Swiss-Prot record:
InterPro entries according to UniProt: P-loop_NTPase, Ran_GTPase, Small_GTP-bd, Small_GTPase
UniProt-recorded name of the protein: GTP-binding nuclear protein GSP1
Protein function: GTP-binding protein involved in nucleocytoplasmic transport. Required for the import of protein into the nucleus and also for RNA export.
Source taxonomy: Eukaryota, Fungi, Fungi incertae sedis, Microsporidia, Unikaryonidae
Region of interest called Switch-II, as start-end residue ranges on this chain: 66-82
Region Switch-I: start-end pairs: 34-42
First-listed, main subcellular location of the protein, grouped into a coarse class: nucleus
């Protein structure tokens, strides 16, 4: 079977301060920074995975990074996107309520067919009331978008949004990632929602064991 390199443009969208840039930094190199200086302008992060058929799946991830209020620039970021990952702070009702506006603006540029993933970030925070999935779906008017609770701080479920999108783009619902090219497998911390995710972790562990020693 011929191995391929597949490339997709993905937008990270949501209010400022919900953890978009922190999340993508976590995916790229395992780094978590609670405090950082927001980047001015769009930033394109290449995020690469290897699947179980040897294909390289590359996501060109566009982070709006501090430009959320500049409507003209947002259109430029969205054009040509294959899909989007929307973020909100699971402890902040206003960031959840704003999801509907973000989705509407994205779909006005890209259309309604591009797949969408919704991420409730900061699920690790203790002693604060968290927004329920039911409320999120009410805000999004019952749209059946894929939904994940994640933590950029602990890396909880941080790869599942990309895994879900890869399955849609390739038409392979059983696709698994055998490695995150950007990060050592030992950094992965998943909540196993299905046999497929469990199988993914098994592959990651095997890949780690087979890696040559320095």
């Amino acid at each position: 079977m011929e191995r391929r390199e597949l490339t997709y443009k993905i937008c990270l969208i949501g209010d400022g301060g919900v953890g978009k840039t922190t999340y993508i930094n976590r995916v790229l190199d395992g780094r978590f920074e609670k405090n950082y200086n927001a980047t001015v302008g769009a930033v394109n992060h290449p995020v690469t995975f290897l699947d179980d058929q040897g294909n390289v799946i590359k996501f060109n991830v566009w982070d709006t990074a501090g430009q959320e209020k500049k409507a003209v620039l947002k259109d430029v970021y969205y054009i040509g996107a294959s899909g989007a990952i929307f973020f909100f702070d699971v402890t902040s009702r206003i960031t959840c309520q704003n999801l509907a506006r973000w989705v509407k603006e994205f779909q006005a540029v890209v259309g309604n067919e591009a797949p969408i993933v919704v991420c409730a970030n900061k699920i690790d925070i203790k002693n604060r009331q968290k927004i329920s999935k039911k409320l999120v779906m009410e805000v999004l008017k019952g749209k059946n978008y894929e939904y994940f609770e994640i933590s950029a701080k602990t890396a909880h479920n941080f790869g599942l949004p990309f895994l879900h999108l890869a399955r849609i783009f390739t038409g392979r619902p059983d696709l698994i990632f055998v490695s995150n090219v950007n990060l050592e497998p030992t950094e992965v911390n998943y909540d196993y929602h299905s046999p497929e995710e469990s199988k993914y972790i098994d592959y990651m562990e095997q890949a780690s064991k087979m890696a040559p020693e320095e």
